[in-house]
């Protein structure tokens, strides 16, 4: 599902380069725990002006990753960008599996004795 997002910061700042680096290096708990269905790199930032595109980027990290691009300044908010994820793989089925893996890894789901 491709969406356009808007971001407004509390303080006036130019975070364009920092934001790109943050997206490129972001790692969450599923990556730290190396869960089986977690993508190795959760977010990929694409520099091209025409990316992300569904036909090229929806299957990033077997559909479990997020593709982000077209970061630009906005007149109403501070920044806007486009985000793309696979609605079925990342959203419904894969998201549920990843949640179950995380619950097991954190000890909320245990083997019944």
Label each residue range with its predicted role.
Residues 50-113:
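C-terminal helical cap and adjacent loop that interface with cofactors, partners, or active-site loops
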Residues 1-78:
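C-terminal substrate-binding/catalytic lobe of Rossmann-fold NAD(P)-dependent oxidoreductases
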């Amino acid at each position: 599902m491709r969406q356009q997002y808007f971001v407004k910061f509390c303080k006036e700042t130019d975070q364009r380069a920092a934001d790109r680096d943050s997206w490129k290096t972001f790692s969450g708990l599923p990556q730290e725990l190396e869960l089986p269905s977690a993508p190795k790199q959760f977010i990929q930032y694409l520099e091209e002006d025409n990316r992300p595109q569904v036909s090229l980027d929806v299957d990033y990290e077997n559909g479990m990753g997020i593709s982000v691009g077209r970061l630009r300044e906005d007149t109403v908010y501070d920044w806007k960008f486009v985000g793309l994820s696979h609605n079925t793989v990342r959203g419904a089925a894969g998201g549920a599996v990843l949640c179950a893996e995380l619950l097991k890894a954190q000890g909320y789901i245990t083997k019944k004795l």
